A protein has these predicted regions:
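PP2C/PPM-type serine/threonine phosphatase catalytic domain
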Residues: 1-124
Length: 124
């Protein structure tokens, strides 16, 4: 029997500054596979929903890997499999982010601490 668990904990600086934990971990197990993820949030001030992004990343990895067929490992090269997985995970993550934004738009409250100079500095 395989036993597994995940534990995500908030760092001291986030507690001290009253910030939400931006990291996320999850696991999935069935008779064919065990998938364990650990996703780190973006960590910058401008990433106001980083805690959701890491959750979406974790869920995207699990969803894509659950859909992966064992036979694919015999049909394609390791490089092709990795490139395909990266693309599928990214597409799934983007879809999750877009669905979330459609359900809950970014509010002024979430971005009041940001100004244009700060945004352009971080993206430059």
């Amino acid at each position: 029997m395989i036993a597994y668990f995940t534990k995500t904990s908030i760092g001291y600086s986030h507690i001290k500054e009253n910030k939400v934990c931006q990291d996320y971990s999850a696991c999935y197990h069935d008779e064919d596979r065990t998938i364990i993820t650990a996703c780190d949030g973006h960590g910058g001030e401008i990433y106001v929903r980083s805690h959701l992004g890491s959750k979406f990343a974790s869920n995207a990895v699990i969803k894509v890997l659950r859909e992966l067929e064992r036979s694919d490992f015999y049909k394609y090269s390791r490089k092709d499999i990795c490139n395909n997985l990266r693309l599928k995970i990214l597409c799934e993550w983007n879809a999750m982010v877009e669905r979330d934004l459609l359900k809950k738009y970014i509010t002024k409250k979430e971005v009041t601490h940001l100004n244009e100079d700060r945004l352009f500095q971080d993206f430059a």
